[in-house]
């Protein structure tokens, strides 16, 4: 990828243009429309624009011709369709079918280039902010900005590390690639704000330990400086609670359960808010589109290109209840049948998916166009979406204001990047791994207080139960992937009654091979230290299950 791993000094950020930022740079706008490190050092307004660009870039469209490339939430969706709890109806409009079908996942395809280049451009945007602030001479506002730069860089590297790290699978237990090189625990190259041109051309994949230490250092700096922020701008920016949450994620990845438990609790306490209520989650106008209910999220505005495009955004793909979006046109989102069946009927979260006809939960489903009419002496919901959405279809992510007809309103929505609920589950899993029984108690307390007053678990695998409840809680938020890969969980799409498309019914023994992402060929070409040390291509590594 061009200029991905060059020093930011004197180098333009590939793809990070002023259109991705919320403020213009009047006195420092170059002819190319891009931002350089020197400009940031000399212009306060340029620095402000770069800081504003951090949350803005995550919502930006990578390529308007590739409708699956609408930013971080598109990458979240990529991870979701690689699991077995998230099912998409097979349809010609399904832009994400290659990832579900595990095809075109090798290093030479555009699909992989989107993920790789998007993350590294985000890293470079963070590097610009970090490099622009001298902490010894900075104002309080500048120190807060420095903390933001470190937090964003850490968050992006943590995602990349968990996606690109090669872990053993049933396809390649020896962890050797096509060249015979052992790639176990290798992640991706680390590009910092001080990396020079020469070093960038010989920048190897970091080991798990090297990457862990780097991210931990960034989060330590974020923790130190982010307290100087005066506002998290209505949860669109990370704050101290979010930094603690990122640390909890990091320590889980590193299997440091004591620290994961510690920082999950710090995140909960520092945030101070409560988990979403049933009314919050199932509201037909604000259900899972209200950023005030989360620790950190992304908020679309009418000025975002993703909104102006109408169909290249989170709501278009995540919400089944629109007449303008991709999902509403056919490739609707469902929960895997095996997951739905396992949820207790007394757990109110189960109503966020369409119940089978005749189920006692059918009447509890709410639709954005619900309308009760008398039919044969019985009041019946004559919602058109009730008829259109398939059984097990999602009712979780509502269009803004419940407006399913006008994209200019419906997609001016928000999506979550971190919720406090995740921290409760991290705390429970970490506790259970440290002292069996303690985590299950934490889970039971959470479930009975917030999700299912009648909750009881009588099984013998507490870790499995904690992870299951976590996946139900965070369904569609791009996070199940990480637990599947980290905890070596099998993916099971093929079984009697499955609602997966027959060609996507892959069953694995442990984590799937397709969850080890390949580094793109362009990086190999520009960076010899990576060449020959890439992850093996996992495309079509499994045959579909046949009934």
What does each of the following model-derived ranges do?
Residues 23-77, 328-334, 339-357, 361, ...:
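Membrane-proximal, proline-rich intrinsically disordered regions
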Residues 35-38, 69-76, 164-184, 228-311, ...:
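Short, surface-exposed recognition loops and adjoining beta-strand edges that mediate ligand/DNA contacts
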């Amino acid at each position: 990828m061009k200029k991905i791993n060059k020093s930011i000094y004197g180098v333009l950020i590939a793809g990070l243009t002023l259109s991705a930022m919320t403020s213009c740079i009047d006195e420092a706008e170059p002819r190319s429309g891009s931002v350089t490190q020197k400009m940031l050092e000399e212009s306060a307004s340029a620095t402000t624009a770069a800081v504003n660009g951090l949350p803005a870039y995550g919502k930006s469209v990578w390529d308007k011709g590739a409708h699956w490339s609408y930013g971080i939430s598109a990458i979240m969706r990529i991870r979701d369709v690689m699991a077995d709890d998230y099912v998409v109806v097979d349809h010609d409009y399904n832009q994400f079918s290659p990832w579900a079908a595990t095809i075109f996942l090798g290093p030479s395809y555009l699909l992989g280039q989107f993920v790789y280049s998007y993350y590294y451009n985000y890293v470079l945007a963070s590097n610009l902010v970090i490099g622009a602030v001298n902490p010894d001479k900075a104002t309080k506002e500048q120190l807060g900005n420095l903390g933001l730069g470190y937090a964003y860089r850490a968050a992006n590297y943590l995602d990349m590390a968990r996606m690109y790290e090669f872990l053993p699978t049933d396809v390649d237990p020896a962890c050797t690639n096509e060249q015979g090189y052992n790639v176990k625990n290798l992640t991706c190259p680390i590009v910092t704000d001080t990396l020079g041109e020469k070093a960038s051309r010989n920048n190897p994949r970091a080991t798990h330990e090297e990457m862990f230490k780097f991210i931990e250092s960034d989060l330590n700096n974020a923790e130190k400086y982010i307290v100087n922020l005066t506002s998290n701008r209505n949860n669109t920016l990370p704050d101290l609670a979010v930094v603690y949450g990122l640390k909890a994620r990091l320590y889980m990845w590193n299997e440091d359960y004591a620290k994961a438990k510690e920082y999950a609790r710090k995140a909960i306490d520092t945030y101070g808010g409560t988990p979403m209520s049933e009314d919050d989650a199932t509201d037909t106008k604000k259900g899972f589109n209200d950023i005030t209910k989360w620790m950190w999220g992304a908020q679309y505005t009418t000025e975002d290109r993703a909104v102006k495009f109408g169909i290249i955004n989170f709501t278009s793909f995540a919400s089944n209840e629109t007449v303008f979006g991709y999902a509403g046109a056919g490739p609707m989102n469902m929960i895997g049948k095996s997951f739905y069946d396992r949820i207790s009927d007394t757990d109110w979260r189960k109503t966020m998916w369409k119940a089978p006809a005749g189920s006692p939960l059918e009447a509890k489903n709410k639709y954005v166009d619900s309308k009760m009419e008398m039919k044969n002496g019985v009041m019946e919901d004559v919602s058109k979406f009730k008829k259109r959405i398939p059984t097990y279809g999602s009712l979780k992510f509502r269009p803004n204001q419940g407006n399913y007809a006008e994209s200019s309103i419906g997609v001016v929505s928000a999506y979550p990047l971190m919720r406090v609920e995740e921290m409760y589950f991290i705390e429970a899993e970490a506790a259970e791994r440290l002292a069996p029984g303690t985590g299950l108690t934490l889970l039971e307390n959470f479930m009975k207080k917030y999700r299912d007053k009648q909750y009881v678990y009588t099984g013998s695998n507490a870790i499995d139960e904690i992870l299951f409840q976590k996946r139900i809680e965070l369904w569609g938020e791009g996070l199940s992937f990480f637990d599947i890969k980290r905890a070596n969980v099998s993916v099971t799409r093929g079984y009697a009654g499955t609602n997966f498309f027959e060609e996507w019914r892959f069953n694995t023994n442990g984590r799937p091979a397709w969850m080890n992402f390949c580094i793109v060929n362009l990086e190999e070409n520009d960076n010899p230290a990576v060449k020959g040390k890439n992850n093996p291509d996992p495309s079509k590594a499994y045959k579909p299950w046949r009934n």
